[in-house]
């Protein structure tokens, strides 16, 4: 079931982005598809297709691991790279524009490490 949800997110999010952009073009049919792909990415239609693939891959990874796991892993890498203590990293996390619940969850994971 988890793999199904992961695949669905990998397909659904790019499709949703595509439909939203397509609805803003005011065009229909092939012209709408062409205009949407050209608007989505750098380099015209090919860039748009690549952008949708990257969005799908990102959505798939996020659905597989979850936001908190990705943010926690990123914070641990920042701690190692910048040679920060747990307390310094927790202060840095408090400044991030994320929910209080997610901040507490990430800080707990950092303190456990």
Which stretches of residues belong to each language-model region?
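Small-residue-rich hydrophobic membrane-insertion segments
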Residues: 4-70
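Amphipathic, membrane-inserting segments
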Residues: 64-113
